[in-house]
Amino acid sequence: KLDEYLAHGLTHLNISVDSLKREQFQEITGVDRLPQILDAVDYAMKLPLMRVKLNAVLLQSTPKELDFFLEYVSTRKLDIRFIELMETGDNHAYFKQNYLPAQELITKLQSREWTTTPAPIGSGPAKMFSHPDYKGQVGVIAPYSKDFCTGCNRLRFSQNGALRLCLFGEGSYTLR
């Protein structure tokens, strides 16, 4: 299907991968599909896409897996973006148990000599980090940071097809 989407103008690909450890991925998602997803990522990188990005929700377990993510970008020219977990109306207990402030990940990256990559205006809310020994980059999307809304230029869709103009807003528009 990816070839078909490319023929119709696909230029970017974002894929959610909350863990690179198969067992942890299955625990988070409820499906054992990590090998197929990673095969699809490698296939997509061979196509003339402008950019491939992986998104992972930043959780308490992320620091234990940081080496797996960094190893993954060591040989692949792609971005892995960690998105700070947001508290919503229906995830208070999960949030309390799993929330990890983005600054903790940023501190770990900086201690390993990852440096902030200047972002062009309009590039979105991710704070990007690079390292001279790695082909890929690591991004951190921190909605609770002081300057998140200033750099946000995104519209978001829920899994139910509702358009959300703001992560912090309660309203949405059904597009179905």
What are these regions (language model features)?
Residues 1-79, 83:
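Radical SAM/AdoMet-radical enzyme domain recognition
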